[in-house]
């Protein structure tokens, strides 16, 4: 049996699956098996790699914290509720400032007491809102988002009371 024909008959997908299960040393030795294998091993798709790290996020104690992209940085937002756990009283946001040092900045926004909130599966729901222009979606849920979190320089005390803390 011609060994060159056998190696060439193995599909690239099967070959990649085999290589992913081998050690680096074994992969390096297999470059000399055939020209096709050597070209696959040198291709950018095979040699690219990503580095992942774990981040200490002790600020996120609750499962209701949502991870967000805040101006290109990792952020997390959640709501603090009153003692009954029904009405949100604070919107809290953490932003990862330094990945290496695990430094987080914390921003707390006190929600106005004048707004009537409704319990809505751990989301902020405000009573008395009207959706206009969504006739095609009458039988579906409509979500309205207020963009206070994006603008940390809001100075209107009637809307938000902000305190910025450094959390290391």
From Swiss-Prot:
This is Putative F-box protein At1g30945. InterPro entries: F-box-assoc_dom_typ3 (IPR013187), F-box-assoc_interact_dom (IPR017451), F-box-like_dom_sf (IPR036047), F-box_dom (IPR001810). Residues 5-52 form the F-box domain. Disulfide bonds: none annotated.
């Amino acid at each position: 049996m011609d060994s060159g024909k056998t190696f060439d008959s193995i599909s690239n997908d099967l070959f990649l699956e085999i290589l992913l299960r081998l050690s680096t040393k074994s992969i390096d030795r297999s470059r000399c098996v055939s020209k096709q294998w050597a070209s696959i091993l040198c291709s950018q798709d095979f040699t690219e790699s990503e580095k992942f790290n774990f981040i200490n996020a002790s600020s996120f104690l609750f499962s209701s914290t949502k991870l967000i992209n805040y101006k290109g940085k990792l952020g997390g937002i959640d709501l603090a509720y009153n003692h009954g756990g029904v009405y949100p009283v604070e919107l809290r946001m953490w932003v990862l400032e330094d990945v290496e040092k695990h430094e987080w900045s914390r921003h707390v926004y006190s929600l106005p007491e004048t707004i009537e909130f409704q319990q809505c599966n751990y989301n902020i729901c405000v009573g008395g809102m009207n959706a206009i222009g969504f006739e095609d979606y009458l039988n579906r849920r409509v979500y309205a988002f207020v963009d206070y979190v994006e603008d940390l320089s809001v100075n209107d005390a009637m809307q938000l009371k902000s305190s910025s803390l450094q959390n290391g």
